[in-house]
Amino acid sequence: MKSSPAELISEAKSSTQNSKMKRAVSVLDFILRLIAVVATLASAIAMGTTDESLPFFTQFIRFRAEYDDLPTLRLFVVASAFASGYLILSLPLSILHITRSSARRTRVILIILDMVMLTSLTAASSAAAAIVYLAHKGNAKANWFAFCQQYDSFCERISGSLIGSFIAIPLFIMLILFSALVLSKR
């Protein structure tokens, strides 16, 4: 059965609107990836360069606090750097989606890899947040003392470095949702 001219025009308009929506979402995807790169890279650098030394009795004996004294903070640096590297490598695919809005396979690959990065960054950030909480508050039952009264600069830096990762986590969620939205619109 032949379609009427009105139906053909309606389908063409729908296809054009769908293409414009995909392109707009792809541009937003690129911008969100750039913001997430900055957030995760800043978190990794801030945590990875955190250390503080305090004198003990004399100036020759010093106590030193570094991020790599705690394996959880090391995991945080690795996960943030890995997520940042992934986001940088995914930018060309995001540009491809702006130019070719019909690319489906690469969107599926990005959704899967975005989910992997989301879960690893969430796990590392949550574990680091627990350690930062213990550093600030301690745990009297386990006889762990809060050391942030002595190492205040160290604690401020490790607390601040969590901000970037907790900004990147919702960005990853939005990236996944936007890619799924584009895939659902045919």
UniProtKB/Swiss-Prot annotation:
Topological region Cytoplasmic: 1-26, 96-107, 183-186
Native organism: Lotus japonicus (Lotus corniculatus var. japonicus)
Keywords for the protein's UniProt record, in alphabetical order: Cell membrane, Cell wall biogenesis/degradation, Membrane, Transmembrane, Transmembrane helix
Membrane topology: Multi-pass membrane protein
PANTHER family in alphabetical order: CASP-LIKE PROTEIN, CASP-LIKE PROTEIN 1U1
GO cellular component, one term: plasma membrane
TM regions (residue ranges): 27-47, 75-95, 108-128, 162-182
Protein known as: Casparian strip membrane protein 1
GO biological process: cell wall organization
InterPro entries noted in UniProt: CASP/CASPL, CASP_dom, CASPL
Domain of life: Eukaryota
Record bears the keyword rRNA-binding: no
Keyword Transmembrane helix: yes
Function: Regulates membrane-cell wall junctions and localized cell wall deposition. Required for establishment of the Casparian strip membrane domain (CSD) and the subsequent formation of Casparian strips, a cell wall modification of the root endodermis that determines an apoplastic barrier between the intraorganismal apoplasm and the extraorganismal apoplasm and prevents lateral diffusion.
Subunit structure as annotated in this protein's UniProt entry: Homodimer and heterodimers.
Similarity annotation: Belongs to the Casparian strip membrane proteins (CASP) family.
Compartments in which it is found: Cell membrane
Extracellular topological segments: 48-74, 129-161
